[in-house]
């Protein structure tokens, strides 16, 4: 966090953030929905200080007041976008719920190692005031407000709008988007005010994905394949970039961290591609495919070809490396994006997945690997599922990983993870030449939680990180 007395939260620049203190604790939501355990989801606090006697242990659990919320992603009440405002303090974690559409505001300032509920925004406020539901990404704005993307409407249809919360009272103020401007689908978003732009992505209709994944629903148009470009000051959708068959289900989107940059990268889950989006000379925005993970021909799986399923992506704070997870194939990749038009693969590590040697799936044709990877065992625990959410340390040298995607899809694709619980792992990163190596001394086994096996999802540090903070 900022050290000067006249500064606001976060850091002045992304490169300043890279010099920030090493992370000591992590927050992550743990989900019981669809596990057969009728208990509330909770926010776990994990000790990640190697000098601590409680290293790689859950040191606190904050249960939510309700069941079946499906905690998912989180954001901050304020971040580096408010760096110039000394009145702003980063002390509340915003937890929108994917299924219930509640919003929990969690106080992490009073005692960072023991968070507490500060406020609950009930679903009816989101439904009535905004006509939105199924909340996903939360970002703080430079003006002090909090903006949360929606995936649907209250009836289960796709609807990509944005809820605005007051940054002090956390009351629902209404929609960010102008009336009638919501996109057909929603998911993630990132803004870049110096170019007067925001770009949002598309998952699918909640009434489709909430019941499990079906390929025929993709073919029926119930999942997205476009980037939606917004005028940042007028709150209007000014362009739709259709990514086509190569861009099915675009999920996490990241502009480069440099606030002057007019380009970024987005991962498309089902097509297993990464697109570079960029501003053209005429002011319009365009996209080009820069990475393609080939599908594998398989036997013993739901389909004859298995996609990698790119689910989470990150860009290091110096805009040098891209990281992403292939949830089904089971690997995390590191690319040098010094030239974002030509990413170069410099690191790769397998951490589970659906093509393990000795498992039910036989790979018949593989353009990447000579043989199926072996199961991964850490501290005696066989890693279930596949790598999913990732978070990079500020200095870029450590990557934290969890392996739950969404409870219903976890149950469909990795039923063993429902029984065993998910895990949290840590990868050491070579930031000079590239390279990823598993830390054998770090494991959080969420199969051994007091309330029973649980599914752990997105990761956050108290001082912000490369996916929560936006520089303006």
Curated annotation (Swiss-Prot):
An individual GO BP term: protein transport
Membrane topology, record value: Peripheral membrane protein
EC number: 1.8.3.4
Disulphide-bonded residues: none
Localization: Nucleus; Cytoplasm, Cytosol; Membrane
UniProt superkingdom: Eukaryota
Keyword line: Cytoplasm, Membrane, Nucleus, Oxidoreductase, Protein transport, Selenium, Transport
GO CC terms of this entry: cytosol; membrane; nucleus
Catalysis: reaction(s): methanethiol + O2 + H2O = hydrogen sulfide + formaldehyde + H2O2 + H(+)
Function: Catalyzes the oxidation of methanethiol, an organosulfur compound known to be produced in substantial amounts by gut bacteria. Selenium-binding protein which may be involved in the sensing of reactive xenobiotics in the cytoplasm. May be involved in intra-Golgi protein transport.
Entry protein name: Methanethiol oxidase
């Amino acid at each position: 966090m900022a050290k000067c007395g006249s500064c606001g939260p976060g850091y002045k620049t992304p490169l300043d953030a890279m010099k920030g203190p090493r992370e000591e604790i992590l927050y992550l939501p743990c989900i019981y929905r669809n596990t057969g355990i009728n208990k509330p989801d909770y926010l776990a606090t994990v000790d990640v200080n190697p000098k601590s006697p409680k290293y790689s242990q859950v040191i606190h659990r904050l249960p939510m007041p309700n069941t079946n919320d499906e905690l998912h992603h989180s954001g901050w009440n304020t971040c580096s976008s408010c760096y110039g405002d000394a009145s702003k303090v980063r002390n509340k974690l915003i937890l929108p719920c994917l299924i219930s559409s509640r919003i929990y505001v969690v106080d992490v300032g009073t005692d960072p190692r023991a968070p507490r509920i500060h406020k609950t925004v009930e679903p009816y406020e989101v439904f009535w005031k905004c006509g939105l539901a199924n909340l996903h990404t939360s970002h703080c704005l430079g003006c002090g407000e909090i903006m949360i993307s929606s995936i649907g409407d209250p009836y289960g249809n796709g609807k990509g709008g944005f809820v605005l919360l007051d940054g002090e009272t956390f009351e629902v103020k209404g929609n960010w988007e102008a009336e009638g401007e919501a996109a057909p689908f929603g998911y993630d978003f990132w803004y870049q005010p110096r170019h007067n732009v925001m770009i949002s992505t598309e998952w699918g209709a909640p009434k489709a994905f909430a019941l499990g994944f079906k390929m025929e629903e993709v073919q029926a148009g119930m999942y997205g394949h476009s980037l939606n470009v917004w005028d940042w000051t007028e709150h209007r959708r000014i362009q739709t970039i259709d990514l086509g068959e190569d861009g099915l289900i675009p999920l996490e989107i990241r502009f480069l961290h440099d606030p002057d940059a007019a380009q970024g990268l987005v991962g498309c889950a089902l097509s297993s591609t990464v697109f570079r989006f960029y501003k053209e000379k005429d002011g319009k925005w365009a996209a080009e495919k820069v990475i393609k993970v080939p599908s594998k021909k398989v036997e013993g799986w739901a389909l004859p070809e298995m996609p990698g399923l790119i689910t989470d992506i990150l860009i290091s704070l110096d805009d040098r490396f891209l990281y992403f997870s292939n949830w089904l194939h089971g690997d995390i990749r590191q690319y040098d994006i010094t030239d974002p038009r030509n990413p170069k693969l410099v690191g790769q590590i397998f951490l589970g997945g659906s093509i393990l040697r000795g498992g039910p799936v036989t790979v018949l044709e593989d353009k990447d690997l000579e043989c199926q990877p072996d199961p991964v065992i850490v501290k005696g625990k066989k890693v279930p599922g596949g790598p999913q959410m990732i978070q990079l340390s500020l200095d870029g040298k450590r990557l934290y990983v969890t392996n739950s995607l969404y409870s219903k899809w976890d149950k469909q694709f990795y039923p063993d993870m429902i029984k065993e619980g998910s895990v949290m792992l840590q990868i050491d990163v070579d930031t000079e030449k590239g390279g990823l190596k598993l830390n054998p001394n770090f494991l959080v086994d969420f199969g051994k939680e007091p309330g029973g096996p649980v599914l752990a999802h997105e990761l956050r540090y108290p001082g912000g990180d490369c996916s929560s903070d936006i520089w303006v």
